[in-house]
Amino acid sequence: MSDHLLRDEHQENVQPRKLLVPVGGRTVLGVLQENHRGPKALKVSKPALQQTQVLSVNHLGVNDENYGKIPARKAASKQPAFTIHVDEPDCATNKRKAVHKKTVQDENLQQLNSVLGSIGTRKPLHPIQIAMETSFGSPMDVSIVDEEQKVVGCNNVADYAKEIHTYLREMEVKCKPKAGYMQKQPDITGNMRAILVDWLVEVGEEYKLQNETLYLAVNYIDRFLSSMSVLRGKLQLVGTAAMLLASKFEEIYPPEVAEFVYITDDTYTKKQVLKMEHLVLKVLSFDLAAPTILQYLNQYFQIHPVSPKVESLSMFLGELSLVDADPFLRYLPSVVAAAAFVIANCTINERTWSDPLVEYTSYTLETLKPCILDLYQTYLSAASHQQQAVREKYKAPKNHAVSLIIPPESMSTFL
């Protein structure tokens, strides 16, 4: 190896020049004072070199031919301080690795072939004996189903039906509006309230809201008007806020606030609707889970099963009672629901209140008679009523067109 190569390989033994040290170098973690003596440690004094040579001589054996001879100083200076290991070229190493890898792959391939040969030929699977036109139901299926599916509500649990009914009977007293509140309103009348409820029925149909949402909204309106005086210009705002609250409480996907602003023909702003919603919540003390006529009807249908037509007629009569505050605010929702059930059952099946329902509700026909007569008069005058949204709603085939059914001539034969 030439002196030039030795100088290149031994650059770490050459004292660094001052120009190689940067002025503003990177600061080492901590100030290590001992490490600043590095350049001085590279200088080797002559006595130290001679001592190294003597030590190397003393290590020779006695029988060695060079024993006792001191090598020339010039020759010692040419000997390198340590030997340098030169790695083999990368191409040779890579070649050996490639050969070894190929050998391992060949061995693995031979083992795999032997295993597959021992397994033998795979037998085909037996065909499933199912007709190709057979379809499996999917929870994501959104196809139209001709058969009407009955929705089971959370209040229709048979094991807890009695406890639920008892709880609802207690809550309906707490959430009952004042019967004569309209007489204390200085600027609105019962006819204005009827127009508002009729409009809410149309809103519910437009956005395909649940019937329960309508019942809750009317309950919120009546309870709010029982405590607060409202100007006629703000009555629709109260109804809009009540419908918004009921939608949030009952619907899975309630309409946005902007939708309610739109249906008022931009009469009110979004800020006004939200502010009224906040006021309604404060007046109602955040008690939104009010029992409704529809909840009681569903319970009565569980105790005394009837045809879908009787169910639709009962719900039609229940919604008719929402339009006029007088006289139906005098009755509890459970009583109005029972009266609607009796009239519908008498109209279609010519039957009245059954014994299981008497035992379940503790209501007798004699107890229900005043409400039955009031609701029957409303049923008779439904076709000539000024507000027709409920009647139009129940003309639809999905509701069995029960609003077109002619009411019985008299209820006295059934009572």
Curated annotation (Swiss-Prot):
A GO biological process held by the record: cell cycle G1/S phase transition
SUPFAM superfamilies the UniProt entry points to: Cyclin-like
Record function comment: Cyclin which controls both the G1/S and the G2/M transition phases of the cell cycle. Functions through the formation of specific serine/threonine kinase holoenzyme complexes with the cyclin-dependent protein kinases CDK1 and CDK2. The cyclin subunit confers the substrate specificity of these complexes and differentially interacts with and activates CDK1 and CDK2 throughout the cell cycle.
Matching Pfam families: Cyclin_C (PF02984), Cyclin_N (PF00134), Cyclin_N2 (PF16500)
Lineage: Eukaryota, Metazoa, Chordata, Craniata, Vertebrata
Keyword Cell division: yes
UniProt KW Cell division keyword: yes
Domain of life, source organism: Eukaryota
Organism: Xenopus laevis (African clawed frog)
Cellular component terms per the entry's GO annotation: cyclin A2-CDK2 complex; cyclin-dependent protein kinase holoenzyme complex; cytoplasm; microtubule organizing center; nucleus
UniProt keyword terms in alphabetical order: Cell cycle, Cell division, Cyclin, Cytoplasm, Mitosis, Nucleus
Localization per Swiss-Prot or TrEMBL: Nucleus; Cytoplasm
Similarity comment text for this entry: Belongs to the cyclin family. Cyclin AB subfamily.
One MF term in the entry's GO annotations: cyclin-dependent protein serine/threonine kinase regulator activity
Protein known as: Cyclin-A2
Tissue: Ubiquitous.
Quaternary structure (record): Interacts with the CDK1 and CDK2 protein kinases to form serine/threonine kinase holoenzyme complexes.
CDD domains per UniProt: CYCLIN_CCNA2_rpt1 (cd20561), CYCLIN_CCNA2_rpt2 (cd20564)
